[in-house]
């Protein structure tokens, strides 16, 4: 399919991304390699997946409400955060190139970022600060940037994980929150504008991980430089 899309529309014109796991056995036969997370380095650079490792490292366990991530108090995640910055593509061991990785912390399934943070942070002002930190972290990682619509104004599903069968009142975008959380929304806008000025983060080619250098870490803190030349 990837090859035919390239022939018909041109290389890089049509993106192919998916969830990197199978719910059950598949009908794949012979030596064909299924497009699962563990096989991503064997796939074409234009075939990519949602990166749950980055998501969970930043905000915490996707299924366990009380298990936090880096931003809400978990220890020992510094190396995972640095791997996330490079879209897990260092030396091509896990991922060929950042083009294969969707960098995100919330999507249509599971808790929204705001609801997940509420599980461990009761004070709203602190939650806003931590939300900003989470956004700043994944928006300064390599890969294809993605965020849930409304995340920028603290989208909530009233704490429910999956709302595919819930009424529209729960799934709709509450635009009143866009005004209530103007500061958070403006912060997201600033991060997006900043990212566009940093080619080292937007580079999705093989070897782009080399643009991240002199990284360091200590307990609860990570740092790195980005090569933005070219």
Residue ranges and their predicted role:
Residues 115, 158-163:
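Cytochrome P450 core scaffold surrounding the K-helix E-X-X-R motif
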Residues 94-97, 165, 193:
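Short, functionally important structural connectors and interaction interfaces within domains
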Residues 164-173:
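Acyl/amide activation-and-transfer machinery of modular secondary-metabolite enzymes
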Residues 78, 98, 110, 166, ...:
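Alpha-helix initiation and N-capping motif
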Residues 3-8:
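Alpha-helical structural signal in soluble globular domains
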Residues 174-206:
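Catalytic cores of secreted or luminal carbohydrate-active enzymes
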Residues 2, 13-149, 153-154, 199-202, ...:
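Conserved alpha/beta catalytic core and glycan-binding cleft of carbohydrate-active enzymes
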């Amino acid at each position: 399919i990837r090859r035919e899309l390239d022939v018909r529309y041109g290389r890089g014109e049509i993106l192919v991304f998916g969830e990197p796991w199978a719910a059950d056995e598949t009908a794949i036969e012979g030596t064909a390699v299924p497009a699962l997370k563990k096989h991503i380095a064997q796939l074409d650079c234009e075939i990519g997946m949602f990166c749950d490792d980055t998501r969970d490292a930043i905000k915490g366990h996707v299924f366990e409400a009380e298990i936090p991530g880096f931003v809400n108090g978990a220890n020992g995640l510094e190396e995972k955060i640095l791997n996330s910055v490079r879209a897990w593509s260092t030396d091509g061991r896990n991922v060929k190139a950042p083009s294969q990785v969707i960098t995100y912390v919330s999507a249509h399934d599971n808790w929204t970022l705001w609801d997940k943070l509420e599980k461990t942070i009761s004070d709203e002002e602190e939650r806003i600060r931590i939300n900003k930190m989470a956004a700043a972290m994944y928006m300064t990682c390599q890969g294809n940037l993605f965020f849930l619509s409304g995340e920028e104004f603290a989208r909530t599903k009233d704490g429910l994980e999956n709302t595919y069968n819930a009424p529209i009142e729960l799934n709709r975008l509450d635009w009143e929150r866009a005004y209530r959380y103007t500061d958070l929304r403006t912060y997201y806008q600033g991060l997006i504008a900043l990212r566009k000025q940093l080619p080292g983060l937007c580079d999705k080619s093989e070897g782009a991980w080399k643009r991240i250098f002199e990284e360091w870490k200590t307990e609860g803190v990570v740092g790195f430089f980005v090569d933005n030349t070219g």
